[in-house]
Curated annotation (Swiss-Prot):
Residues 237-252 are annotated as: Interaction with N protein. Signal peptide: none annotated. Residues 18-47, 99-112 are virion surface. It comes from Porcine transmissible gastroenteritis coronavirus (strain Purdue). This is Membrane protein. GO terms for cellular component: host cell cytoplasm; host cell Golgi membrane; membrane; viral envelope; virion membrane. Pfam families: CoV_M (PF01635). Residues 69-77, 134-262 are intravirion. Changing residue 33 to R: In DM25-3/49-12; does not affect production of alpha-interferon by the host organism. The keyword Glycoprotein applies. Homomultimer. Interacts with envelope E protein in the budding compartment of the host cell, which is located between endoplasmic reticulum and the Golgi complex. Forms a complex with HE and S proteins. Interacts with nucleocapsid N protein. This interaction probably participates in RNA packaging into the virus. Glycans are attached at residue 32. It is found in: Virion membrane; Host Golgi apparatus membrane. Component of the viral envelope that plays a central role in virus morphogenesis and assembly via its interactions with other viral proteins.
Length: 262
């Protein structure tokens, strides 16, 4: 509260009689010697009045918001991660609704400059929202994975093994991909993506799907121990194109599967 009062004093010095601060807890007169008492002075400045009455509530909201952003990752908590995704999905429509409402309110009071800025903000928000959906649908078309609609997903790693496709969302395109096999469990980027595998099940190539293209990574080296189903395999970029990442179960060669177009 003292910080808010100091802030109010600074604003009072800059803005004259609209904002003020109390001389003491008992004296309700303003420090800048205005005729009105501090209650009317605070009410006259909406921002200061709001901070003075809602600062604790906003601090709790911001603490929760920071916690969700900081620890909203699957390796920490799936629950917090789900809340983070919900917030990110709701931000676009909420911001769009706020800009439209602000445009309406500014038009009602004939503030046409702010009305223009509000309309521009609404258009930009809507375009960015549509771009998100377009990119997500393009990525889903390649991978058939709901991770495509994750706002943080820039690419999806696709590994075909045992007749199935295993996917992992990525925040960027890697230079190389390492698959680690530990006691029959397959790991990529530190995450377990499959179980019950042996060295013969490791694929000859993996793919990283982007909205615009699919990058193929070919196996270039591996070190495996058959007795314990443990080892690693390393893949590097070999080609890129409009390839499908779906696992094929029909009688196709590896090259034919690779050239299967979306």
């Amino acid at each position: 509260m003292k910080i808010l009062l100091i802030l109010a004093c600074v604003i009072a010095c800059a803005c004259g009689e609209r904002y003020c601060a109390m001389k003491s807890d008992t004296d309700l007169s303003c420090r800048n010697s205005t005729a009105s008492d501090c209650e009317s002075c605070f009410n006259g400045g909406d921002l200061i009045w709001h901070l003075a009455n809602w600062n604790f509530s906003w601090s709790i909201i911001l603490i929760v918001f920071i916690t969700v952003l900081q620890y909203g990752r699957p390796q920490f908590s799936w629950f917090v991660y789900g809340i983070k995704m919900l917030i990110m999905w709701l931000l676009w429509p909420v911001v769009l609704a706020l800009t439209i409402f602000n445009a309406y309110s500014e038009y009602q009071v004939s503030r046409y400059v702010m009305f223009g800025f509000s309309i521009a903000g609404a258009i930009v928000t809507f375009v960015l929202w549509i771009m998100y959906f377009v990119r997500s649908i393009q990525l889903y078309r390649r991978t058939k994975s709901w991770w495509s609609f994750n706002p943080e997903t820039k690419a999806i790693l696709c590994v075909s093994a045992l007749g199935r496709s295993y996917v992992l969302p990525l925040e960027g395109v890697p230079t190389g991909v390492t698959l680690t096999l530990l006691s029959g469990n397959l790991y990529a980027e530190g995450f377990k993506i499959a179980g019950g595998m042996n060295i013969d099940n490791l694929p000859k190539y993996v793919m990283v799907a982007l909205p615009s293209r699919t990058i193929v990574y070919t196996l270039v080296g591996k070190k495996l121990k058959a007795s314990s189903a443990t080892g690693w395999a390393y893949y590097v970029k070999s080609k890129a194109g409009d390839y499908s990442t779906e696992a094929r179960t029909d009688n196709l060669s590896e090259q034919e599967k690779l050239l299967h177009m979306v």
